[in-house]
From Swiss-Prot:
Sequence similarity: Belongs to the D-isomer specific 2-hydroxyacid dehydrogenase family.
Gene3D superfamilies tied to this protein: NAD(P)-binding Rossmann-like Domain
Active-site residues from the entry: 236, 265
Keywords, alphabetical: NAD, Oxidoreductase
InterPro entries in UniProt: D-isomer_2_OHA_DH_cat_dom, D-isomer_DH_CS, D-isomer_DH_CS1, D-isomer_DH_NAD-bd, NAD(P)-bd_dom_sf
Name this polypeptide is given: 2-hydroxyacid dehydrogenase A
EC number, UniProt record: 1.1.1.272
Coiled-coil segments on the chain, per record: none
GO molecular function, one term: NAD binding
Segments crossing the lipid bilayer: none
Catalyzed reactions: a (2R)-2-hydroxycarboxylate + NADP(+) = a 2-oxocarboxylate + NADPH + H(+)
Biological function: 2-hydroxyacid dehydrogenase that is capable to reduce pyruvate, hydroxypyruvate and glyoxylate in a NADPH- or NADH-dependent manner. In contrast to 2-HadhD/morA, does not recognize 4-methyl-2-oxopentanoate (MOA) as a substrate.
Claim: Endoplasmic reticulum is one of the keywords in the record: no
Length: 347
């Protein structure tokens, strides 16, 4: 069994190799590619039986058809999201497709809270200021989180972990999720999205990207938000209309924005562009605001999460090889496992 891993970094290789040696020594031979899977690079998977991809790899119909023609039969997503793959085409072609639905919800939840506190208390700016010998506090005034209302959009594993942390801060929690969730009711109440936006001092997104959730944060919904509220997104960049956010920042409707994801991140994130001219004018404009914090999709990036990703991904591959039922399969017995009766808004 030959496995081609795309968008591979040094840490991917470290954890996959370690997991392979310890738990699956005879499972497969791995080839690592540092570049993303796309129509330009798909030919390099022609000698592989399976491919392993990440959030910014491209698996549209032409890529899937080429993979199949070249003998690939299994697609392993080492992430929870699957918006970058055409699952209907994958089903039609007969691919085995599996993801890692939960590799460290606490890691992402903790990072979301860190973004809120960094943005709210301006610790990133304070760090730079004191290094220059300036201990002035002007411009650093924040707000106490205790007693504030925090809106959680999507209370799956990550959203629930986030809610538990903010409950410990003494925040009032409201959530929107058409799936509901009994456990969340221990910490807060469910409301409609419009009510959540109007009530919340902080809005945190914890939902996958679907056609129904794309640009859920747009001009209309930003206008419904409480004036001066903070917006945090650690889920998928396409949930947020960046141009609309810029307008809301300029008008003062938004009090601040913290993004670990960006709708056009595919051409930028996970690579070093410090010696280049970045031509994304929208992102560059966004980062000129003093009340904006942008990170490079690192919320998941902990030792525990990387170990779990490698373990579950290789376990999924073993299920495929041994023809076992895979609990993480997105295409099972010729049918999509993704809900179709209502748009999923949880991770």
């Amino acid at each position: 069994m030959k496995l081609a891993v795309f968008s591979a970094k040094s840490y991917d290789k470290h954890y996959f190799d370690a997991t392979l040696r310890k738990h699956h020594p005879a499972l497969c031979e791995i080839t690592y590619h540092s570049f993303a899977l796309s129509s330009e690079t798909v030919s390099l998977a022609q000698d592989s039986d399976a491919v392993c991809v990440f959030v910014n790899d491209q698996l549209d119909a032409p890529v899937l058809e080429t993979l199949y023609a070249n003998g690939v039969r299994a697609i392993l997503l080492r992430c929870a999201g699957f918006n970058n793959i055409n699952l209907q085409v994958a089903e039609d072609l007969g691919f085995f497709v599996a993801n890692v639905p939960s590799y460290s919800p606490e890691a992402v939840a903790e990072f979301a809270v860190a973004l809120i506190q960094t943005l709210n208390r301006k610790t990133h700016r304070a760090f730079n200021r004191v290094r220059e010998g300036n201990f002035n506090l002007e411009g650093f005034l924040g707000r106490t989180l205790y007693g504030k209302t925090v809106g959680v959009v999507g209370v799956g594993r990550i959203g629930l972990a986030f809610a538990k942390i903010l409950h410990g801060f003494g925040c009032k929690l409201v959530a929107y999720d058409p799936f509901g969730g009994e456990e969340f009711k221990k910490y807060g109440e469910f409301v409609e999205l419009g009510d959540l936006l109007a009530q919340s001092d902080v809005v945190s997104l914890h939902c996958p990207l679907t056609e129904g959730t794309r640009h859920v944060i747009n001009d209309e919904n930003l206008g419904r938000m409480k004036k001066g509220a903070l917006l945090v997104n650690t889920s998928r960049g396409g949930l947020v209309n960046t141009k609309a956010v810029i307008n809301a920042l300029k008008s003062g409707q938004l009090g601040g924005v913290a993004l670990d994801v960006y709708e056009e991140e595919g051409a930028l994130f996970y690579n070093d562009h410090s010696g280049e001219i970045i031509h994304d004018d929208v992102l560059m404009r966004l980062m000129t605001f003093p009340n904006v914090l942008v990170c490079g999709h690192q919320a998941f990036f902990t030792e525990e999460a990387l170990s779990e990703i490698a373990g579950v991904t290789l376990g999924n591959l073993e299920d495929f090889v041994l023809k076992r039922t895979c609990k993480n399969s997105l295409v099972r017995e010729g049918h999509l496992v993704v809900p179709t009766d209502k748009e999923p808004v949880r991770l």
